[in-house]
Swiss-Prot record:
One of its GO terms (cellular component) is cytosolic small ribosomal subunit. Belongs to the universal ribosomal protein uS17 family. One of its GO terms (molecular function) is rRNA binding. This is Small ribosomal subunit protein uS17. It holds the Pfam family Ribosomal_S17. One of the primary rRNA binding proteins, it binds specifically to the 5'-end of 16S ribosomal RNA. PROSITE patterns: RIBOSOMAL_S17.
Length: 87
Protein backbone atom coordinates (compact mmCIF):
# COMPACT_ATOMS: atom_id res chain seq x y z
CA UNK A 1 0.00 0.00 0.00
CA UNK A 2 2.91 2.39 0.61
CA UNK A 3 3.84 1.91 -3.05
CA UNK A 4 0.87 4.09 -4.11
CA UNK A 5 2.47 7.17 -2.57
CA UNK A 6 5.10 7.13 -5.30
CA UNK A 7 2.54 7.54 -8.09
CA UNK A 8 2.07 10.93 -9.71
CA UNK A 9 -0.89 12.99 -8.51
CA UNK A 10 -2.17 15.91 -10.59
CA UNK A 11 -4.81 18.54 -9.88
CA UNK A 12 -6.87 19.90 -12.75
CA UNK A 13 -10.25 21.00 -14.07
CA UNK A 14 -12.84 18.66 -15.61
CA UNK A 15 -13.64 19.70 -19.19
CA UNK A 16 -15.72 16.68 -20.25
CA UNK A 17 -17.86 14.09 -18.48
CA UNK A 18 -19.85 12.80 -21.47
CA UNK A 19 -18.30 9.32 -21.39
CA UNK A 20 -19.50 6.66 -18.97
CA UNK A 21 -17.11 6.33 -16.00
CA UNK A 22 -14.52 8.53 -17.74
CA UNK A 23 -13.67 12.21 -17.36
CA UNK A 24 -11.29 14.46 -19.27
CA UNK A 25 -9.12 16.66 -17.04
CA UNK A 26 -6.98 19.62 -18.12
CA UNK A 27 -3.81 20.00 -16.04
CA UNK A 28 -1.96 23.30 -16.40
CA UNK A 29 1.72 23.63 -15.54
CA UNK A 30 4.14 26.54 -15.79
CA UNK A 31 7.69 26.29 -17.04
CA UNK A 32 10.34 28.97 -17.26
CA UNK A 33 11.59 29.69 -20.79
CA UNK A 34 15.27 28.75 -20.94
CA UNK A 35 16.46 31.83 -22.85
CA UNK A 36 14.01 34.62 -22.00
CA UNK A 37 13.00 33.63 -18.48
CA UNK A 38 9.28 34.20 -19.03
CA UNK A 39 6.91 31.71 -17.44
CA UNK A 40 5.08 29.79 -20.17
CA UNK A 41 1.83 27.94 -19.46
CA UNK A 42 1.50 24.37 -20.72
CA UNK A 43 -1.63 22.24 -20.52
CA UNK A 44 -2.23 18.51 -20.80
CA UNK A 45 -5.52 16.68 -21.30
CA UNK A 46 -5.75 13.47 -19.31
CA UNK A 47 -8.50 10.87 -19.35
CA UNK A 48 -9.29 9.51 -15.89
CA UNK A 49 -11.48 6.70 -14.55
CA UNK A 50 -14.45 7.94 -12.50
CA UNK A 51 -16.10 4.82 -11.08
CA UNK A 52 -19.17 6.54 -9.58
CA UNK A 53 -19.60 9.31 -12.19
CA UNK A 54 -19.28 11.89 -9.39
CA UNK A 55 -17.20 14.56 -11.19
CA UNK A 56 -19.00 17.16 -13.31
CA UNK A 57 -17.79 19.75 -15.82
CA UNK A 58 -15.94 22.61 -14.11
CA UNK A 59 -15.00 20.66 -10.96
CA UNK A 60 -11.44 20.84 -9.63
CA UNK A 61 -10.25 17.25 -9.10
CA UNK A 62 -7.18 15.24 -8.13
CA UNK A 63 -6.18 12.31 -10.34
CA UNK A 64 -3.57 9.64 -9.66
CA UNK A 65 -1.48 7.61 -12.05
CA UNK A 66 -2.52 3.96 -12.36
CA UNK A 67 -2.16 0.95 -14.63
CA UNK A 68 -3.56 1.31 -18.17
CA UNK A 69 -7.34 0.93 -17.99
CA UNK A 70 -7.98 1.40 -21.73
CA UNK A 71 -6.20 2.65 -24.83
CA UNK A 72 -6.08 6.22 -23.48
CA UNK A 73 -6.91 6.01 -19.73
CA UNK A 74 -3.88 6.02 -17.41
CA UNK A 75 -5.31 7.89 -14.41
CA UNK A 76 -8.07 7.45 -11.85
CA UNK A 77 -10.07 9.99 -9.86
CA UNK A 78 -8.86 10.40 -6.27
CA UNK A 79 -11.15 13.16 -5.02
CA UNK A 80 -13.25 16.14 -6.04
CA UNK A 81 -11.45 19.10 -4.44
CA UNK A 82 -13.94 21.81 -5.38
CA UNK A 83 -17.32 21.52 -7.06
CA UNK A 84 -18.27 23.84 -9.91
CA UNK A 85 -20.64 26.71 -9.20
CA UNK A 86 -23.86 26.34 -11.20
CA UNK A 87 -25.22 29.68 -12.34
Amino acid sequence: MSERNQRKVYQGRVVSDKMDKTITVVVETYKKHSLYGKRVRYSKKLKAHDENNQAKIGDIVKVMETRPLSATKRFRLVEVVEEAVII
